[in-house]
Amino acid sequence: MKILVTGGAGFIGSAVIRHIINNTDDTVLNIDKLTYAGNLESLQEISDNPRDHFSKTDICDSESLKRAFNDFEPDVVMHLAAESHVDRSIDGPAAFIETNMIGTYVLLEAARMYWLGLPVERKEAFRLHHISTDEVFGDLHGTEDLFTEQTAYAPSSPYSASKA
């Protein structure tokens, strides 16, 4: 299987890619802009693996995403790219809106256009997983509180609102 991972140089994305490369036969294309949150050193242990590929790409760049989809031909997309620091989102929400909302839309459109060109059997199998954050549910008020699948969104920062 071919898996396109956005934000793969980030904390969670790099753990996902290391797991895929170390525990499956799947091939990965890691798309990451390499901002303050991205660090290719977190992928050093797999950097020589021929199933691990990297592209320094901004998910807001539709042409670069279209090329990545057409060249790599993924079966699955795992979308983890995001601006992710709550305090930074309060000080300057524009980058969070740009990456987390507009970038996600651009990625979805690139995936949709790619999907439209797939044969029926590949269309049926194609998946896009958007990995978000528990912050979209707001704050827990006690140690006994839990979020469930039925918990309503209640974001409390520009970051969590941009991921809802």
From Swiss-Prot:
What is any Pfam family matched here?
Answer: GDP_Man_Dehyd
Record-linked SUPFAM superfamilies: NAD(P)-binding Rossmann-fold domains
Transmembrane residues, as ranges? none
Q: Where does substrate bind?
A: 133
Active site, UniProt feature: 159
> InterPro entries given for it?
NAD(P)-bd_dom (IPR016040), NAD(P)-bd_dom_sf (IPR036291)
Give the record's family classification.
Answer: Belongs to the NAD(P)-dependent epimerase/dehydratase family.
Q: PANTHER family in the record, alphabetically? A: DTDP-D-GLUCOSE 4,6-DEHYDRATASE-RELATED (PTHR43000)
What's the protein called, per UniProt?
A: Uncharacterized protein in galE 3'region
